[in-house]
Amino acid sequence: METKKLYECTVIIDGGLQDEVIAAAMEMVQKVIADKGGSISSVLEVGRRKTAYPINKKTIGYYAHIEFTAGTSVIAEIEKVLRYEEALMRYLIIHLTSALLEMRKRVEKYSVVIGSPEDNAGNEVEASEGESK
């Protein structure tokens, strides 16, 4: 029997799509993970955000993180299905090691929550005319 490990899948869905299509894409990602033998432990939907750079000429994406446990052999199968999903702009699956989990706990312990992601959406700092870029 294969040992299951903890993974995190981060997806960026096209933010220009309707909410129903985004919800369907999220359901599809979760269904693929479950169908391939994964067990989802948490889902964090961050929401629509401006991307750091244009992806396929699009600058708004819907971000979500899914933590799940699965065998190492099914990760390639999950990626194969996600690769051809048109609504996904990007995806990344990483193995969450004990060092990453410990670092995450320390960051959460010492971080200050300023507001929800929706409250901070679009808050960008621009240099004034007198400042150099």
Swiss-Prot record:
Swiss-Prot/TrEMBL keywords: Ribonucleoprotein, Ribosomal protein, RNA-binding, rRNA-binding
GO BP annotations listed: translation
GO terms under cellular component: cytoplasm; ribonucleoprotein complex; ribosome
Cross-referenced Pfam families: Ribosomal_S6
CDD domains: bS6
Taxonomic superkingdom: Bacteria
Entry's Gene Ontology molecular function annotations: small ribosomal subunit rRNA binding; structural constituent of ribosome
Recorded family membership: Belongs to the bacterial ribosomal protein bS6 family.
Cited function: Binds together with bS18 to 16S ribosomal RNA.
HAMAP family in the cross-refs: Ribosomal_bS6
Name of this chain's protein: Small ribosomal subunit protein bS6
Gene: rpsF
